[in-house]
Amino acid sequence: MSSEHDTPGEALRLSSTDIRILGSLIEKQATSPETYPLTLNALVIACNQKTSREPVMNLTQGQVGQSLRALEARGFTRLVMGSRADRWEQRLDKALELVPAQLILCGLMFLRGPQTVNELLTRSGRMHDFEDSEQVLHQLERLIARGLALHIPRQAGQREDRYTHALGDPADIEAILAARSNPVERSAGGAVSVERIEELEARIAALEERLAQLEG
């Protein structure tokens, strides 16, 4: 690929920890506005969730804190001073001039990597009201045009194309693409259970958020 929009500039390169932090902040801003911005402890818990995260990570407060400060210096996060605890919020939407729909799609791709349009539509249900898959695709195409997302043509054995963000380290992105080149496709019978899986993940995420509130 040779287009000037194929990849973002060096200023937008993000580490895997940066990506997880931003994705978690975007998610919690949309799903748990009553506890957002997040304390450092709550953010670490969000980053290390066992559900709705691919891959699952085990970040420490030190790692998250260091990345937050680096992201703040680049205008992607902001520390909000509080009387009881300091909290963190994402500023990616303002830094990159993203509309809400684009921010949510970026957040989902940050947290779960390459996904189909239908997966993004289903998983965004708690965060943004897309009318249909065409709206999702339209916003993905706008992100691709700006070099912020990538289109992954369907591979042998796959039924649909996939989309992922383009803000990570090039080596990490190549590894993701390689790992996804021959995935085990869900069977037709298993497709019915996707919504059930998403429902269970949402319930577990809600419990983890309550735990974060108690500990934060």
UniProtKB/Swiss-Prot annotation:
Which InterPro entries does this entry report, sorted A to Z?
A: DUF480 (IPR007432), WH-like_DNA-bd_sf (IPR036388), WH_DNA-bd_sf (IPR036390)
Q: Which family does it belong to?
A: Belongs to the UPF0502 family.
Q: Could you tell me which SUPFAM superfamilies the record lists for this protein?
A: Winged helix' DNA-binding domain
Q: Which PANTHER family match?
A: UPF0502 PROTEIN YCEH
- Source organism of the structure: Pseudomonas fluorescens (strain ATCC BAA-477 / NRRL B-23932 / Pf-5)
- What name appears for this protein in its UniProt entry? UPF0502 protein PFL_4004
Q: Which Gene3D superfamilies match?
A: Winged helix-like DNA-binding domain superfamily/Winged helix DNA-binding domain
| HAMAP family in alphabetical order | UPF0502
